[in-house]
Amino acid sequence: MRSWNSLFCLNSSRPPGHIVYPKHQAGHTGKQADHLGSQAFYPGRQHDYLVPPAGTAGIPVQNQPGRPEGVPWMPAPPPPLNCPPGLEYLSQIDMILIHQQIELLEVLFSFESSNMYEIKNSFGQRIYFAAEDTNFCIRNCCGRSRPFTLRITDNVGREVITLERPLRCNCCCCPCCLQEIEIQAPPGVPVGYVTQTWHPCLTKFTIKNQKREDVLKISGPCIVCSCIAGVDFEITSLDEQIVVGRISKHWSGFLREAFTDADNFGIQFPRDLDVKMKAVMIGACFLIDYMFFERTR
């Protein structure tokens, strides 16, 4: 079976909508990783999610004033039916790359500054820009457990997704204070939640819709560490028998991993997945980043 790194390289060279999963081997009784369509993911809830129509990406647009330069923006495709404003970009893709920017203040003085991220498609075109909205005291006193508001904006600076994380104890031995993040799209309108599920050994989360109904599961390793390699978190069906996607923390090199918080992530999901659930998976990725990969000052 191909390694995740080879799959990531293969998928990054394919056009949107062509995700490659490991083929099912004869005699294999483990989890299935085949793309089985959106109906396999939400048994009995197909009416809650609309399958977006197919489309093609266009020519990259120019960089907008006041935003990071050097990377073209993905052009906006036609919005699907009942699509929240700004989420139409997600209807055309099956992979997202998230790159955290290096903050000079953190490198030189070990002060925790506001995290900022670039969110790109598999072609390297920027889709969104994400910025943490917290104050200095909260960042440096609460560390990785801090509450935050993460504002995700499009190419014209319009806030299209808001992530809200409340203050919770970041201790795996305390099942009464499990982590949670709320995803809003547009701001003020919840579209889903990601909640930590207590387990004595493994890292587990549950993806919920706007009604707080369980939709998908996320399972990670027993020990979450990216000291020498990447880390994968599998997105599965509720019975954890079908793998429908993956959140991966990519190895960024020794110096970057040792001296900065600038992490790189990849998210894979079916192209025909509802855009709201794709936005919720983005929220799950940021929650995982803050919980496990923020350095303790």
Swiss-Prot record:
The keyword Phosphoprotein applies. Keywords: Calcium, Lipoprotein, Membrane, Metal-binding, Nucleus, Palmitate, Phosphoprotein, Transmembrane, Transmembrane helix. Its cofactor is Ca(2+). The chain crosses the membrane at residues 277-293. Expression of isoform 1 seems restricted to testis. It catalyses: a 1,2-diacyl-sn-glycero-3-phosphocholine(in) = a 1,2-diacyl-sn-glycero-3-phosphocholine(out). One of its GO terms (cellular component) is intracellular membrane-bounded organelle. Pfam families: Scramblase. A lipid is attached at C172, C173, C174, C176, C177 (S-palmitoyl cysteine). This is Phospholipid scramblase 2. It comes from Homo sapiens. The lineage of its organism: Eukaryota, Metazoa, Chordata, Craniata, Vertebrata.
